[in-house]
């Protein structure tokens, strides 16, 4: 059994780690108000940012998919690890030594499973890099030199060599304290007929790293004709760490420049990435052992995008027109917001970036990227023959138009579709631009009728904001609409006390559960009370955690996290006055209900038969109305807008 991590270490690590820096390794964040950052959610596909991080409170929350929690929850979710492994990862990040206690072997006490696999891969990368300097690795060095990659380039990209020995790496790593089961789980070793053996032999290797810079696998290139494994390239198999659908070579090196320049360049191979980076195109990445897919796209979009408007560029560099055309045509069926800002670059002679750099130098690669074509244009023009052919053959002109109109009609953005229709007239040499535009619109309308019908039939079921069919009534009731103006003071009051308990403190604690008319908000108020109230002296991420622990309802716990992260739209210097005003407004609403009850009771009483009681209650009413007026004055000066 793994030694237990003391609570004091868990709290200390959470306190020292900056959640915005951790999340920033995976998501590009931009300021969105006081102590609020936002970006595209890494846990579901979205076009507009609904993922928020509150640095001072140490929490995140997505208003699109409801994922949320502290920095440990984020690492658990994004890296698919246990809580213990998340703590260990963050401890490594800040150099914190965990003082485990309880029974455990020395290896178990040292690390959890994921961390052990990361450590094994890192040790393997160092072993392979050292082996690249050996005499046996001369063919690997020659392969790199022939492509104009010197020793410095090899070190920069972590290139290595797998020796010919049956179990050279395996024996080395076992001597360093790793177990064979760990090496097998990491994809570094496997069980052979003669016992444990290395996975890679006599191959040039590239380490594949995560956004956070952790080695999780390798790509290996065949060098020798007598290599029994005929595949030119092989990769680490699917492991706990290595998922080929979501890893990219070079992403660790390109990440910062992708974020800074709002641009990513996607190439097809390891040497292409190396060539691009060395030529100054430092945003180049490549998929590993599989085609570029949705998860790769989602990762790059999170780095490129920074607000509700998609400002980035995704540039695909292909070896030839056929590959580029196939990829471009797929864009019409995918996310066209991305496709509309995607580009294709193909060298005139069909050379890949590595060969182009060899033949024409670094400037040729920079020019290749600079001369990119919009993906929609590339796809459409791939269906149109050379202009001279069209001039000489009227039938070819008609055929080109017939092929191209349906493709242009698939563009869903009306303005963009019309613009490409006009361009299509020019590309095909069609003199009547209006006729082409009308044809495209007619085709688009024909296609849109079944599409609109389909969308109507699934819109309710697929809405991310709807409860699943058959959801319990109490769950539906406990899910308040954040846009409901009648509930706005209650929501703002709860946000204030969860995010700034010191400011909300004593006044909030005077509010009863009955002040919160929505069951969900009332349940949150009850949880705050059970946690000791706003004046308990607990602040930051710990305060929200303590409140969340007071409920057994996952829905209410999620609501607590949501309220603890949702931005309060006011400048820091105005926060105290704003919170006072919010609480005053909520008190005023509650006081209004109390006054209505007193008035109703007075109407049922006789001032003659119940004189003393009547006059006493009337005096209370006068005092209550005076207090309500003071609350109204306080609330009216809070600079709030509902």
Curated annotation (Swiss-Prot):
<dbReference type="InterPro" id="IPR013173">
    <property type="entry name" value="DNA_primase_DnaG_DnaB-bd_dom"/>
</dbReference>
<comment type="function">
    <text>RNA polymerase that catalyzes the synthesis of short RNA molecules used as primers for DNA polymerase during DNA replication.</text>
</comment>
<dbReference type="InterPro" id="IPR030846">
    <property type="entry name" value="DnaG_bac"/>
</dbReference>
<dbReference type="Pfam" id="PF10410">
    <property type="entry name" value="DnaB_bind"/>
</dbReference>
<keyword id="KW-0240">DNA-directed RNA polymerase</keyword>
<protein>
    <recommendedName>
        <fullName>DNA primase</fullName>
        <ecNumber>2.7.7.101</ecNumber>
    </recommendedName>
</protein>
<feature type="binding site">
    <location>
        <position position="268"/>
    </location>
    <ligand>
        <name>Mg(2+) 1</name>
    </ligand>
</feature>
<dbReference type="InterPro" id="IPR050219">
    <property type="entry name" value="DnaG_primase"/>
</dbReference>
<keyword id="KW-0862">Zinc</keyword>
<dbReference type="InterPro" id="IPR006171">
    <property type="entry name" value="TOPRIM_dom"/>
</dbReference>
<keyword id="KW-0639">Primosome</keyword>
<keyword id="KW-0235">DNA replication</keyword>
<feature type="binding site">
    <location>
        <position position="319"/>
    </location>
    <ligand>
        <name>Mg(2+) 2</name>
    </ligand>
</feature>
<feature type="zinc finger region" description="CHC2-type">
    <location>
        <begin position="41"/>
        <end position="65"/>
    </location>
</feature>
<dbReference type="GO" id="GO:0003677">
    <property type="term" value="F:DNA binding"/>
</dbReference>
<dbReference type="Pfam" id="PF01807">
    <property type="entry name" value="Zn_ribbon_DnaG"/>
</dbReference>
<dbReference type="GO" id="GO:0005737">
    <property type="term" value="C:cytoplasm"/>
</dbReference>
<dbReference type="InterPro" id="IPR006295">
    <property type="entry name" value="DNA_primase_DnaG"/>
</dbReference>
<keyword id="KW-0808">Transferase</keyword>
<feature type="binding site">
    <location>
        <position position="321"/>
    </location>
    <ligand>
        <name>Mg(2+) 2</name>
    </ligand>
</feature>
<dbReference type="InterPro" id="IPR034151">
    <property type="entry name" value="TOPRIM_DnaG_bac"/>
</dbReference>
<dbReference type="GO" id="GO:0000428">
    <property type="term" value="C:DNA-directed RNA polymerase complex"/>
</dbReference>
<keyword id="KW-0479">Metal-binding</keyword>
<dbReference type="GO" id="GO:0008270">
    <property type="term" value="F:zinc ion binding"/>
</dbReference>
<feature type="domain" description="Toprim">
    <location>
        <begin position="262"/>
        <end position="348"/>
    </location>
</feature>
<feature type="region of interest" description="Disordered">
    <location>
        <begin position="445"/>
        <end position="480"/>
    </location>
</feature>
<keyword id="KW-0548">Nucleotidyltransferase</keyword>
<dbReference type="InterPro" id="IPR002694">
    <property type="entry name" value="Znf_CHC2"/>
</dbReference>
<dbReference type="InterPro" id="IPR013264">
    <property type="entry name" value="DNAG_N"/>
</dbReference>
<dbReference type="GO" id="GO:1990077">
    <property type="term" value="C:primosome complex"/>
</dbReference>
<dbReference type="GO" id="GO:0006269">
    <property type="term" value="P:DNA replication, synthesis of primer"/>
</dbReference>
<feature type="binding site">
    <location>
        <position position="319"/>
    </location>
    <ligand>
        <name>Mg(2+) 1</name>
    </ligand>
</feature>
<dbReference type="Pfam" id="PF08278">
    <property type="entry name" value="DnaG_DnaB_bind"/>
</dbReference>
<dbReference type="GO" id="GO:0003899">
    <property type="term" value="F:DNA-directed RNA polymerase activity"/>
</dbReference>
<dbReference type="Pfam" id="PF13662">
    <property type="entry name" value="Toprim_4"/>
</dbReference>
<keyword id="KW-0238">DNA-binding</keyword>
<dbReference type="InterPro" id="IPR037068">
    <property type="entry name" value="DNA_primase_core_N_sf"/>
</dbReference>
<dbReference type="InterPro" id="IPR036977">
    <property type="entry name" value="DNA_primase_Znf_CHC2"/>
</dbReference>
<dbReference type="InterPro" id="IPR019475">
    <property type="entry name" value="DNA_primase_DnaB-bd"/>
</dbReference>
<comment type="subunit">
    <text>Monomer. Interacts with DnaB.</text>
</comment>
<keyword id="KW-0460">Magnesium</keyword>
<dbReference type="Pfam" id="PF08275">
    <property type="entry name" value="DNAG_N"/>
</dbReference>
């Amino acid at each position: 059994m793994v030694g237990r991590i003391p609570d004091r270490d868990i709290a200390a690590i959470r306190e020292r780690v900056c959640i915005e820096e951790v999340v920033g390794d995976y998501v590009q964040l931009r300021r969105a108000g006081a102590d609020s950052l936002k970006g595209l959610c890494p846990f579901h596909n979205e076009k507009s940012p609904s993922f928020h991080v509150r640095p001072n409170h140490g929490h995140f929350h997505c208003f699109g998919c409801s994922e949320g929690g502290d920095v440990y929850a984020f690492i658990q979710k994004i890296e698919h690890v246990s809580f213990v492994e998340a703590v260990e990862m963050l401890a490594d990040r800040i150099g914190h030594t965990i003082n485990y206690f309880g029974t455990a072997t020395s290896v178990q006490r040292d690390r959890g499973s994921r961390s052990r696999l990361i450590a094994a891969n890192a040790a393997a990368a160092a072993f392979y890099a050292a082996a690249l300097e050996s005499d046996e690795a001369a063919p690997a060095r020659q392969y790199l030199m022939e492509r104009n990659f010197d020793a410095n380039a090899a070190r920069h990209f972590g290139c290595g060599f797998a020796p010919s020995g049956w179990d050279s790496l395996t024996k080395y790593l076992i001597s360093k304290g790793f177990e064979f089961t760990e090496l097998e789980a990491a994809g570094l070793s496997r069980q052979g007929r003669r016992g444990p053996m290395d996975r890679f032999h006599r191959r040039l290797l590239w380490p594949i790293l995560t956004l956070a810079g952790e080695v999780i696998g390798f790509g290996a290139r065949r060098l020798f004709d007598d290599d029994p494994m005929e595949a030119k390239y092989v990769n680490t198999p699917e492991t706990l760490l290595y998922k080929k659908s979501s890893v990219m070579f070079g992403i660790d090196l390109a990440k910062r420049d992708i974020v800074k320049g709002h641009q990513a360049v996607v190439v097809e191979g390891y040497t292409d990435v190396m060539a691009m980076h060395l030529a100054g195109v430092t945003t180049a990445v490549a998929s590993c052992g599989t085609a570029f897919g949705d998860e790769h796209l989602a990762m790059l979009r999170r780095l490129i995008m920074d607000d509700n408007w998609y400002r980035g560029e995704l540039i695909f560099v292909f070896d030839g027109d056929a590959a580029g055309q196939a990829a471009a045509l797929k864009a019409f069926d995918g996310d066209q917001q991305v496709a509309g800002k995607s580009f294709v670059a193909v060298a005139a002679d069909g050379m890949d970036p590595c060969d182009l750099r060899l033949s024409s130098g670094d400037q040729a690669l920079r020019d290749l990227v600079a001369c990119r074509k919009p993906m929609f244009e590339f796809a459409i023009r791939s269906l149109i023959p050379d202009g001279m052919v069209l001039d000489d053959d009227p039938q070819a002109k008609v055929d080109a138009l017939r092929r191209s109109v349906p493709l242009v009609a698939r563009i869903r953005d009306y303005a963009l579709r019309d613009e490409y229709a006009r361009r299509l007239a020019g590309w095909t040499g069609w003199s009547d631009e209006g006729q082409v535009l009308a044809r495209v619109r007619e085709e688009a309308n024909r296609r849109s009728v079944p599409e609109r019908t389909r969308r109507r039939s699934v819109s309710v079921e697929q809405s991310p904001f709807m409860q699943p069919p058959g959801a319990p009534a109490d769950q539906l009731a406990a899910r308040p609409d954040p846009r409901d103006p009648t509930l706005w003071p209650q929501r703002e009051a709860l946000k204030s006390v969860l995010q700034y308990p010191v400011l909300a403190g004593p006044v909030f604690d005077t509010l009863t559960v009955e002040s919160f008319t929505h069951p969900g908000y009332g349940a949150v108020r009850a949880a705050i009370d059970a946690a000791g109230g706003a004046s308990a002296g607990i602040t930051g991420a710990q305060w929200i955690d303590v409140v969340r622990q007071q409920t057994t309802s996952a829905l209410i716990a999620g609501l607590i996290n949501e309220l603890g992260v949702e931005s309060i739209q006011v400048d820091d210097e105005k926060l105290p006055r704003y919170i006072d005003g919010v609480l005053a407004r909520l008190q005023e609403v509650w006081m209004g209900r109390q006054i209505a009850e007193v008035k109703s009771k007075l109407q049922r009483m006789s001032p003659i038969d119940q004189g003393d009681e009547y006059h006493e209650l009337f005096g209370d009413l006068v005092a209550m109305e005076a207090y309500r007026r003071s609350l109204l004055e306080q609330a009216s000066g809070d600079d709030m807008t509902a």
